[in-house]
A protein has these predicted regions:
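Register position in tetratricopeptide repeats
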Residues: 37-38, 71-72, 105, 139-143
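Alpha-helical segment of the N-proximal tetratricopeptide repeat
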Residues: 26-50, 54
Length: 149
């Protein structure tokens, strides 16, 4: 009988600990977002990475990491995180917009064009950026493409 009571106590403690860990997991993204808005990028980056550990399909955490790497001018890491967002949600127009800007910055005409075509199909909250994208894209259009249009 004592063993059964002891076993119940152990199970109770185990479930209490796990429920606290679960509650903590949920707040990683929200805390990271608050720190990001305060421009505390280093600490917010750590919290977004923790959120990804517990929730690998957290497209928002990947997106905020991409924004942090954009701010740090780390194009390689920004692209990795944007690709992760687009793998999780191919219609995330903010990620597509950021990828277009990155590809234009890298003077990658073909990829830029591909993302712009996709952006025109799925734009939702970033449709107002179409003119900005067009102007930036026209600066990298090759001469032979300009004559075809």
């Amino acid at each position: 009988m004592k063993k059964i009571v002891f076993l119940y106590k152990i199970l109770l403690v185990y479930f209490l600990i796990n429920s606290n860990l679960f509650a903590e997991k949920i707040s990683f993204f929200e805390e990271g977002k608050k720190l990001f808005e305060k421009k505390n990028f280093l600490e917010s980056k750590i919290l977004f990475e923790k959120d990804i550990v517990f929730n690998p399909l957290s497209e928002k955490s990947y997106l905020y990491l991409a924004k942090i790497f954009n701010f740090d001018s780390n194009d390689e890491e920004e692209e990795v995180n944007l690709n992760n967002v687009l793998l999780i949600n191919p219609q995330n127009d903010e990620a597509i917009y950021m990828m277009i800007i990155l590809k234009i910055k890298q003077s990658d005409y073909d990829e830029s064009k591909k993302f712009i075509d996709n952006f025109n199909l799925v734009c939702n909250s970033f449709c107002s950026k179409k003119e900005e994208i067009r102007k930036k894209f026209n600066k990298i259009v090759p001469e032979n493409e300009k004559s075809n249009n």
